[in-house]
């Protein structure tokens, strides 16, 4: 049976983890956010979030964005490849409704989980 928990092992926790993702990564983006991914040697995907105060001004907005990203990742984790993902917010992300943001994330997860053609 699949589990949908979002445990500590499913998170990028240290600056070193984030740095590894930014090196030799591939990305999928939209006008509202970018997801950067890099393969890991683990048996599960991991998620990191980068939501700059400069992009989403209010704490409420940043927390909403992070909450929806975590929930989307939690529900899609069993279909995702074993990669480390970093979601980076852009200014226009605060204008999306919760449902629009959730649907956009679903499409980007799917795009990044496809096998590479190279």
Curated annotation (Swiss-Prot):
It is an enzyme of class 3 (hydrolase). It catalyses: Endonucleolytic cleavage of RNA, removing 5'-extranucleotides from tRNA precursor. Disulfide bonds: none annotated. One of its GO terms (cellular component) is ribonuclease P complex. One of its GO terms (molecular function) is ribonuclease P activity. Coiled coil: none annotated. GO terms for biological process: tRNA 3'-end processing; tRNA 5'-leader removal. Its EC number is 3.1.26.5. Keywords: Endonuclease, Hydrolase, Nuclease, RNA-binding, tRNA processing. RNaseP catalyzes the removal of the 5'-leader sequence from pre-tRNA to produce the mature 5'-terminus. It can also cleave other RNA substrates such as 4.5S RNA. The protein component plays an auxiliary but essential role in vivo by binding to the 5'-leader sequence and broadening the substrate specificity of the ribozyme. Belongs to the RnpA family. Consists of a catalytic RNA component (M1 or rnpB) and a protein subunit. This is Ribonuclease P protein component. The lineage of its organism: Bacteria, Pseudomonadati, Pseudomonadota, Gammaproteobacteria, Vibrionales.
